[in-house]
Amino acid sequence: ECYAGQRVAINLSNIKKKEIKRGCVLAPVNSMKNTDLLDVKLNVLDSSLRVLTNHSRLHFFTGTSEVLCRAVLLDKEEIGPGESGYVQLRLEEEIAVRRGDKFVVRFYSPMETIGGGVILEPNPKIKRRFQDDVIEELERKESGSSADVIALHAKAHGDTLISCAELAKLTALSPEEVAEDVKELEEEGTIY
């Protein structure tokens, strides 16, 4: 067992060095879904000398990954020093992340750290700016439990059936967490 901040080594048999790169995530098969869109809560540093504007190009860092992205501000025109906001990051490459993962963003040029935050939704749909329902959904995802997130995903699928395995992949939760939350939601009558 290892913890954040520790260095570890893993022996991966039958894997060639060119098949993996810095930032790859080691996870059980079909437990995560690669994404190039992220819904996040972004906090700009008090010490930042710059203001984040819509469609700013940024360097995104999480774990050992570094990816270029565009920041679409969902609830504000700009985010200044010491402020925070809901942002959809549109990545230039796909990565695998989980809800709750922390990240850091830096300006594209000059490469100065602007802030960081937490991933609220690892597999969102493209969102439009200044939509009340979008902001409400992100507020629920920020303050809610994993059961709330599952309920939102089930609602988004409407009349179609979605399996627990697919919910686990979409939410990047473990199958056990999903099964427990689905049982709780069924008992409440939230989902059927």
Where are these predicted regions, by residue range?
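C-terminal effector modules of nucleic-acid-centric enzymes and ribosome-associated factors
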Residues: C2, N14-Y192
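Membrane-interface junctions of multi-pass transporters
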Residues: A4-V8
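NTP-handling and nucleic-acid-processing catalytic cores
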Residues: N11
